[in-house]
Every structure is written in structure tokens, then in C-alpha cells.
Amino acid sequence: MIRKIIFLEMLLLGIATFLYSQDEISKITITHGPYLQNVGSNEATIVWITDKPSIGWVELASDGNGSFYAKEHPRYFDTSNGIKNTSTIHAVKVKGLTPGKQYRYRVFAQEVLKHTGYKIIYGSYASTDVYYRKPLTFHTCNPQAPATSFVMVNDIHGDNKLLEDLMSRCNLTQTDFVLFNGDMLSFINSEDQLFKGFMDTAVRLFASEIPMYYARGNHETRGVFATEIQRYFSPCQEHLYYAFRQGPVYCIVLDTGEDKPDSDIEYAGITQYDLYRTEQSEWLASILESTEYKEAPFKIIVAHIPPAVTEAGPDEDWHGNVEVEQKFMPLLRQAYPDLMLCGHLHRFVRHDATDKTSFPVVVNSNTSLLRIYATTTQMKIEVMDRDGKMPVSYTHLRAHETCADL
């Protein structure tokens, strides 16, 4: 009898241990992120990824540096048309924020084990840590700030070491935002490739707390996963092209699409970028007429593919360059921006203002970090390579004035 009791006790203990271990194994985790997208003066989007289907939400605190556990915080859920999304990709757009203010935040996910009819069975939670670490923070944009500082990286094609080297050349504590100007990968075939290719590194270095604005390059249009890109970048925006203002700088971020004709055999009949750029030009025309654009001391155009120019090199007059020249540049020449920032060419090029085009076009190389510090009267532009050398540095004055090399 005693043996039977001992056997039953051991059996029950074994079952309990097994169930506990299975529960531990099956706990949901946040696999990537969180990171910031489309931060504006009164809104911000936060994105994170989980390993299991779940609902997700953000808790936001604007009450200084006290404990995050001091009081309950409002929850902002990942929803679509009034329904909480069950997904492994979560994106929450928080509105009604105050310009130039710091916010602390925490992201959550709760696994959805089963959903049938009116019955939903939930599983365990996952969240960012606010017990052993300080909560993540971000600042909303402040259009009234007297100055701003930002950096741009492009064309790293999945080279994480290069990205880390370049980002080490800037003081992130004095950087308001980061521009990724396209071709951060050579193609996109999976979510795993996107994060291992550069985004996990970006999150580790800065992207959870410093806004990152993304301009799609022609290589992000390639691969079976290319159609999914807006689930990760600008996920709560209507388009992949958009505009924002930080301090004296108003940025218009364009999506220049592919670099060859839609009919090229390389695209296998899957692209329609000529029409896409035409539709985008209509949006651009309206933005250039906006009060926000006209009132900004400095206007910067961000576009991966540079326009075709008269003195173009052998790789500056492809179809994509011509499309940018024909569909975007006529509008820009009438609106007098101060600067156009591009990538794509894998080398540094600077086309100064001419009688035809009143603003310079600066093409950053694939192995350099471009850094800009702007006040209401001038912009200082520096280009640094991964070794910290600064081959280019000059000051750019307001539109219609000249650039002075330093």
C-alpha cells in the first residue's frame, strides 16, 4: 500500500513538473523591437514582434522619472476597425501627445491560444522590462525647437558591422532622429532576414528610443517578402512616403521605387512603379503647398534614387533617375527646398545649385554617415566614414544662398 502511495505521489509530481516545464517552454516572448516609427509632434507609432499570435498594447507614462509602477497607465491597443488584432506583428499609433515632450513606455503582448465565436482563450504575457531597467523613452518632435541634429545611413545591404561602425561615429544623446535612406538589405525574403539584416542592430543601438524614419530603396522592393514591408515601416500611415518636422527642418520622405523600367525582365512582370511615382507626385504637389512646408526655415527632400542631371555619371541616368527628374523635380524646383539627400550610387556625389535647380543634391556613399546640425539660419553638413575620418564638411545657408566649404 505504501509503495502504491509513493508511486502515485511520484507520478503526480512528474506530471506537474512536465506541465510546468511545458508552460515555461510555451511562454510567449517579444522577439524583435520595440522600435519607433513616424514620430510626430503629437503622435508616435511603436512596433514590436512576438513569437506567437497575440494581442498587444502600449502603456504610456508622461509623469516624470518616478517608478513605472506608481500608478496605472493608459493602454493603447493594436487594433483594426475596433477589433484588437491577433498577430505576431504589433503596431500601435498613439495620438494626442504634446510636442517636444518625453514619454516613457512599455509594450505588452498576451498570447491568444484559441478564438472561436464568442470564446477566446488567452495565454501568458510578455512585456518589456521596467523592473530591472529604466522604462524605454522617446521625445515627440518639437517644431518650435531652435535647432536639430540628425544622421543618415544608406545602402549597407545587410552589413551589420558597417551599420554599427557608422552609428558609433555620432553622439546618439545629441541626435534627434536617424534617417535610413534605402537599400538596407539587398532583397527581402522573410521577416527573419529583415531583422537579422539590420533592424535588430538598429534596435540594440538606438531605435527603441530615437525615432528612425525609413525611405524605401530599390532593393527593398525585391524578394517575396517585399510586399510586407509596410507592416514594419510606416505601418499606420497611408503610404510609405510622408513628411514630418523636427525643429527648423521639414523633411519630405519620398519613395522612388525601382531603378529600371517596369517591363525589365529582372522584375518578372511584378512591378508598376511608373504609375506609383505619378500618384506620389500628386501627393507631393499638395505637401509643397502646405503651410507646414512653407513656414519651415529649412526644407529637406529625402529620396533614395537621385534625379538624372546633365552631368550625370554612367549610373545616374537609369530609368529610376529619369522618373525622379521628370515627376518630382519640376515640382521641387517651383517650391525651393534647401537640400535633397539621396543614396543609391554607393559613392559620395554633390551637385551644387544651378540656375535650373536652386538647391543642391547630396548623395551619401554606402560606407559613410551623413550628419546634419541645423539652426534657423544654417545647416552644417558632415560626412564621416567608418574610421571616423571626415572627408566632407560644409555649411549650407538658407535657400538661394551659397554653400561654404569648411
What are these regions (language model features)?
Residues 40-43, 54-57, 67-77, 82-83, ...:
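N-terminal active-site segment of His-dependent metallophosphoesterases
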Residues 108-137, 193-293, 327-331, 350-375, ...:
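Extended active-site neighborhood of metal-dependent phosphoesterases/phosphodiesterases
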Residues 48, 100-109:
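Short beta-strand segments enriched for Tyr within beta-sheet-rich domains
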Residues 152-154, 178-183, 212-218, 301-303, ...:
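Active-site neighborhood of phospho(di)ester-bond hydrolases with catalytic His/Asp-centered motifs
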Residues 267, 273, 292-339:
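Active-site-proximal segments of metal-dependent phosphoesterases and phosphodiesterases across multiple
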